[in-house]
């Protein structure tokens, strides 16, 4: 029987770091620390959650994470609330295709409220994967108090 491959040193360090951050509320402490210069607002924008997170999402996310970290280190409070109000049109196009809709009247017959709820549910299909990957790339975002 083949031996199970052991985790690399990098993978073990990642797990240790994430565990330390979580057990010691490091992100929470960074957000709650004194902010003598007041609040700095950073509008991150939601992910394109039309599928699983991929390299392009991760690169953009890492770059965007640098801005609130910089301003936090400069003495500002920078809230980092994650959100799921995901770019309506791409999600709507996916849902229309899944439901076989060709025209606006199809949406009206289906019901606008019901269509909107179906779109919202479609966005949240991948929420769990996003909630796993964002901390793993070292990004600090408040996903527990997210907005939908």
Per-range role (PLM):
Residues 1-148:
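N-terminal, positively charged nucleic-acid-binding surface of large information/translation enzymes
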């Amino acid at each position: 029987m083949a031996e199970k491959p052991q985790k690399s040193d990098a993978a073990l360090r990642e797990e240790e770091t994430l565990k330390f951050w979580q057990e010691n509320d490091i992100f929470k402490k960074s957000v709650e620390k004194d902010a003598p210069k007041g609040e700095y607002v950073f509008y991150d924008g939601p992910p394109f959650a039309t599928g699983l997170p991929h390299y392009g999402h991760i690169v953009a996310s890492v770059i965007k994470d640098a801005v609130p970290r910089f301003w936090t280190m400069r003495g500002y409070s920078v809230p980092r609330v994650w959100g799921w109000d995901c770019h309506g049109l791409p999600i709507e196009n996916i849902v229309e295709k899944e439901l076989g809709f060709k025209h606006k009247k199809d949406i009206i017959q289906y019901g606008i409220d019901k269509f909107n709820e179906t779109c919202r549910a479609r966005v949240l299909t991948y929420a769990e994967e996003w909630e796993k990957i964002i901390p793993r790339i070292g990004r600090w975002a408040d996903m527990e108090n997210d907005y939908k």
